[in-house]
C-alpha cells in the first residue's frame, strides 16, 4: 500500500484541537490529478462542509496544469469528497455542534487514488496556543539539559 503525500496542512495542528480523523476520496478532473501528482497543491484556508447530503471541500488550491489547454480546471473550485453515506451523516451530526469544523490535514495518493485526511477539530484559543508553545519549549530545555548531562559523563 504505497502512500505518497502531496501536501500537508501544518498550521491545522497548531490552530485546532484534533478530535478525530477521517479518510475521504477526492473527486477530481484530469488536469487536477496531473497537477496533484506534480505536488502543486495547497490546503491553506481550506475547509470541508456537509451540504445537501454531500461532503464538499472549499478553498483548496490546485495549480492549473502547465501542459493543459483551454479545458484546464479552475484552481480554487469546490470539490466533492467521497465517503460512505453513513459516514457523511455522522459527520453532519458532529459538525452541527458549536465550534467544530472539518479541516483537511493532508492530501495523498493511496494505491493510485487521490485521498484526503480530514479532521474533526475545535479551534484553539490564543492562550491554548501559548500553553502549547511553553510546554514545547520546556520539553526542549529538559531534553537539552539531559543531553548535556549525558555528554559530561
Swiss-Prot record:
GO terms for biological process: trans-translation. The gene is smpB. This is SsrA-binding protein. It is found in: Cytoplasm. Keywords: Cytoplasm, RNA-binding. GO terms for cellular component: cytosol. SUPFAM superfamilies: Small protein B (SmpB) (SSF74982). Its main location: cytoplasm.
